[in-house]
Design a protein with these regions (language model features):
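Short, low-complexity disordered leader/linker segments with a strong preference
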Residues: 1-40, 62, 421-427
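Conserved C-terminal helix/tail region of periplasmic/extracytoplasmic solute-binding proteins
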Residues: 160-161, 374-427
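Hinge/lid segment of periplasmic solute-binding proteins
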Residues: 99-149, 289-291
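Short, solvent-exposed loop/beta-turn-alpha elements that line the ligand-binding surface or hinge
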Residues: 115-127, 168, 185-188, 193, ...
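Helix-loop-helix "hinge/cap" segment bordering the ligand-binding cleft or interdomain interface
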Residues: 62, 68, 135-202, 214-248, ...
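Extracytoplasmic/periplasmic substrate-binding proteins
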Residues: 229-319
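Long, aromatic- and glycine/proline-rich binding clefts that accommodate carbohydrate-like moieties
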Residues: 132-134, 341-393
């Protein structure tokens, strides 16, 4: 398997889009498959830090020795923009990883993906979590291979040192109080935060929508208010790193948790594979556990949010049939077993796959961590709609303004509604 960075395909995209570069200059030669093999290209992000890709590609190559998979590696933060640019330029990468349903909706509505109903029909649809998110008027343009949802990571040693119990069945008020209690100064004089909220809007908006049955495309966002107030209060009290610093310094949530700078952290299940690998490589010794996401009220069902990750076939794929075969394998039981072994939650959930997951070395096995894996409801992070991408852009912009204090919560929520209604919904 050879890995290609985006630079290795930049010449072709440049020719199509007129990007910066000298006309007629020779770009890097694309790696070729070994003689007699098909070279299948797959777009990915942060290949070295996202172990599921290597696991899937190695597994597929072992099962299909006449195929060489070449990852097209893109920086995680640049991924949506770069894939959009590639597609607009007629790039022929075979398989495109759909990082979220927002991007999927845009690519599908733009006619940039191939319909793969023939692949989906071969899958165990009843047990394939997240599949409905890719249904566009009865047509599927991608199939999910993993299904992530959000829960609460916590540092067991930091909680023990503070003399507090593990964070079971927390309400948001209890979570905020606990975060403040856990905030302290480390031996090196640096702050140890009670929690860490990453800069993504979903940390506030998606969980608010999930727990209030809110519609993020509807244009009325009063249900965001309590969640923003909680987040800003934590920031003001110093119980979490302030948003402006995290944004400007491009703070890594992994670094915050793995170096003991944060005692708790709401984050998706995708991080499990990353932290297991970091511990295996000796990059962290954090003693970690999992808990359900905090809830509005205690004693009720656990509601969280999540999003499937999927593979799609580029409309201009160089090897369409092989791309479809790869997706069928990755979204099926063999692909699910492969990623389960490294701590990734697969979209396919049956007894064989689940058993394989919970035998994983290093996965917390305490009752609270196991409970975190069985939320009662997992809402979709963002509705699938042709309006999702435009709405997401507005919500992101206004989210940033609220979090850095340039708008009050009330004014920010009002502005979100006005802009979505006028710019997206045409009201």
């Amino acid at each position: 398997m050879k890995r290609t960075t985006l630079a290795a395909i930049a010449l072709a995209v440049t020719a199509g889009l007129g990007m910066t570069g000298c006309a007629g200059a020779a770009g890097p030669a694309e790696p070729q498959a070994q003689e007699g093999k098909t070279r299948l290209t797959v777009s990915v992000w942060n290949y070295e830090g996202t172990p599921e890709f290597k696991a899937l590609f190695d597994g597929y190559e072992a099962a299909n020795p006449k195929v060489d998979i070449e990852p097209v590696d893109i920086l995680a933060d640049d991924y949506p923009q770069k894939v959009t640019t590639m597609l607009a330029g007629g790039d022929t990468t075979d398989v495109l990883t759909m990082k979220n349903v927002i991007d999927y909706s845009r690519y599908a509505s733009n006619g940039q993906l191939q319909e793969i109903n023939s692949v989906v029909d071969t899958l165990d649809k009843d047990n394939l979590a997240g599949l409905d998110a890719f249904n566009v008027d009865g047509k599927y343009f991608a199939a999910p291979y993993r299904q992530d949802f959000w829960l609460l990571y916590y540092n067991k040693d930091l909680l023990k040192a503070a003399g507090v119990e593990d964070p079971a069945d927390l309400t948001w008020d209890e979570y905020a109080a606990l975060a403040k209690k856990l905030t302290t100064t480390g031996a090196d004089g640096k702050a140890v935060y009670g929690t860490y909220h990453h800069v993504w809007r979903s940390v506030i908006q998606a969980i608010a929508a999930a727990q209030n049955d809110g519609d993020q495309i509807g244009g009325d966002y009063g249900f965001f208010e309590d969640q923003y107030n909680t987040a800003l209060d934590l920031q003001k009290s110093g119980a979490t790193l302030d948003f402006g610093t995290a944004k400007s310094q491009k703070t890594s949530y992994r670094t915050m948790f793995e170096t003991g700078q944060a005692a708790m952290m709401p984050m998706g299940t995708w991080y499990i594979a990353g932290i297991l690998q970091a511990k295996k490589d000796g990059k962290t010794n954090v003693n970690w556990g999992l808990a359900p996401m905090p809830q509005k009220k205690s004693g009720g069902d656990v509601t969280t949010f999540g999003s499937p990750t999927a593979f799609a076939v580029n409309k201009n794929a160089a090897h369409s049939e092989e791309a479809k075969k790869f997706i069928e394998w990755a979204a099926g039981e063999e692909g699910a077993k492969v990623i389960s072994k490294i701590g990734v939650v697969p979209a396919l959930q049956n007894d064989a796959v689940t058993d394989a997951y919970f035998t994983l070395d290093g996965l917390p096995t305490d009752d609270l961590s196991k409970k975190a894996f069985t939320p009662d409801k997992t809402a979709l992070e963002m509705p699938v709609s042709d309006k999702s991408a435009a709405t997401d852009k507005i919500l992101n912009q206004e989210h940033d303004l609220i979090m850095v204090g340039e708008r009050s919560v009330a004014d920010g929520i009002t502005e979100m509604g006005k802009r979505v209604k006028s710019e997206v919904l045409g009201k």
